[in-house]
Amino acid sequence: MNSIISKLNDKRILIFGYGREGKSTENFIKKHVRYKSLDIFEGSILQIDEDKYDVIIKSPGIVMLDDNPKYTSQTELFLDEYHAKTIGVTGTKGKSTTSAMLANVLKGCGVKALLLGNIGKPCFDYIDDIDDDTWIVFELSCHQLLHINKAPHIAIFLNLFEEHLDYYKTLEKYFYAKSNIISHQSENDFCFVGENVPDIEHKSEMKIISSPERDYELNILGEHNKINAEFVFEVAKLFYKADDEIILKGIKEFKGLPHRLEYFAEIDKVRYYDDSISTIPEACINAVKSVENVGSVIVGGMDRGIDYDILADFIRDNENILFILCYETGLRISKMLGFEYEDNSIYPEEFGNIMSTTYVGSWEEIEDVSLPNNVMLTVNLDYAVRLAKQNTKPGMACILSPAAPSYGYFKNFEERGEYFKQLVEQKESD
């Protein structure tokens, strides 16, 4: 950690953002750094007097599309020091599952592996645990990758779909942020890239992963997870301690993560799955294809402006599955499916501030709603679960797979998933 400390010693430091990572940064600095001053700020970047500080360490949720040499991040500082012993994992979907599976497999192969990063473990919290034998499996978001100088020695870029367009505006800018995980590598590095990822100028040794080359036995649902397993297998083979049998055993034994197509209850002979991590149409479609006998799917959340044509077509093509639409994206998808309405004309107060009211209702009483027979439209998750309970037949499954972010309605996808579980498990009389 010496280079990190030397960059911060005798500096006037501002921590910009005080969530989980901001607090982690504060703890690290107070423990290890000889600083001139240390301030914490939560607010608009326009309110920062940059002349007062030598270094500004921002949280990943604060997106800056332009470079400013005073600004840095945990990720940038960490990779500057530990890039040579880091395996970075990015992609629109599957980052957490692949990272956790890889860490599990490496440990089974006798490698000392630390799982850090966007999975909810700030890297500064674990620096004291790193020694010469440690390998870091680092889940990396687009925000973390946007401003880095050095890339991980081994990079995984799983896939690319439309996401975070509320920040980046275009898919090209979003891809540029992600691509830094490879474009900043050197000739001695390795990268593994999904087949739908656009070309990236690179110096490292690259392998394209298009389909599973082995018949993986998994304890988690989804054909897409066999692709994730293929990435894990290929990376694990780089380690001299890893042989095929041990790698395959570790992949098979991996139990998955919460809120990722997680089966959690059977009530009145209906199986319930929490796929709250789903924030794009492709994830929702994969979820439905991965579960047997799907009776109902709850879709909707914050609208980031991504394209939902593929999901609208999927809903039309699956007439035997009930799709319960809610929140902003649910309303937008309903319009794509034929629901005619004037913006802000239906329950504008309740819809505009859903989480600050106890209102629970639906649009089903409106006459002449020209939606397909397999679609229901409602306001929020509370009523969506009620509709699912009323309309999902015994022997079938109900999936929460929103195809949209939780922000504006819940703190994060974890809170949304936990709330879904509570609604499912509570009795109607509660």
Regions found by a protein language model. Give the residues of each.
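A short, basic/flexible loop-to-alpha-helix module at the beginning of a structural domain
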Residues: 1-10, 45-48, 77-79, 262
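NAD(P)-binding Rossmann-fold cofactor-contacting core
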Residues: 31-46
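Nucleotide phosphate-binding/pyrophosphate-handling subdomain across enzymes
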Residues: 28, 112, 221-321
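Active-site beta-alpha connecting loops in nucleotide-dependent enzymes
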Residues: 12-27, 31, 276-367, 381, ...
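Short active-site oxyanion
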Residues: 12-14, 52-55, 112-113, 186-191, ...
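Short acidic-hydrophobic, aromatic-tinged amphipathic segments that line or gate anion-handling sites
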Residues: 72, 192, 208-210, 326, ...
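Phosphate-binding loop of NTP-binding sites
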Residues: 27-30, 46-55, 60-195, 199-207, ...
